[in-house]
């Protein structure tokens, strides 16, 4: 798989798939990883720790609808070239934690519905997010209804055009840091 540049929809709609061995995939040239695992709603685990995402430009809906995934180790993802992360984790409603602290989103323009319906996430650390190029955050955290803490103090909203439904349904947040001081 080392020469593959487009991995979009590779396992799209594989709704009966319970196990998937992609640990040794060579993703070093992949630019498009959109909808890669979309609708794999029976997968409970997915080992992608070794994925080289350094050339990836789009991750739209990459894990959308992976509703049985209980954990996802993406700590090593290099997201420095990614421009679109919309719906990336949307519908991953069994994930209880997601470590995205190392995500470089400095080139991302669209984060719409990124965590939509991640209804079991309790904490999401987005403090390091450089949102200065982001234009869309529509529904970004909507229906994350178990989320208890969210720190958006470093969010720069100067280029954001649409924030509709951004926090809609986040009914358990008791510590909402930085909402009053979103950078303009």
Features from the language model and the residues they span:
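Negatively charged
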Residues: 1-184
């Amino acid at each position: 798989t080392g020469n593959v540049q487009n991995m979009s929809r590779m396992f799209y709609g594989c709704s009966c798939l319970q196990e998937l061995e992609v640990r040794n995939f060579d993703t070093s040239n992949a630019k498009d990883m959109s909808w890669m695992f979309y609708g794999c709603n029976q997968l409970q685990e997915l080992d992608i720790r070794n994925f080289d995402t350094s050339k990836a430009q789009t991750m739209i809906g990459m894990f959308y609808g992976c509703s049985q995934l209980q954990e996802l180790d993406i700590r090593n993802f290099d997201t420095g070239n990614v421009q679109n992360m919309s719906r990336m984790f949307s519908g991953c409603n069994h994930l209880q934690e997601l470590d995205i602290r190392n995500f470089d989103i400095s080139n991302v323009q669209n984060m719409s519905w990124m965590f939509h319906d991640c209804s079991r996430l309790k904490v999401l650390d987005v403090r390091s997010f450089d949102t200065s190029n982001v234009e869309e955050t529509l529904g970004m955290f909507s229906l994350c209804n178990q989320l208890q803490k969210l720190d958006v103090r470093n969010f720069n909203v100067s280029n954001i055009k649409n924030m509709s439904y951004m926090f809609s349904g986040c009914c358990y947040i008791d510590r909402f840091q930085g909402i009053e001081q979103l950078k303009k």
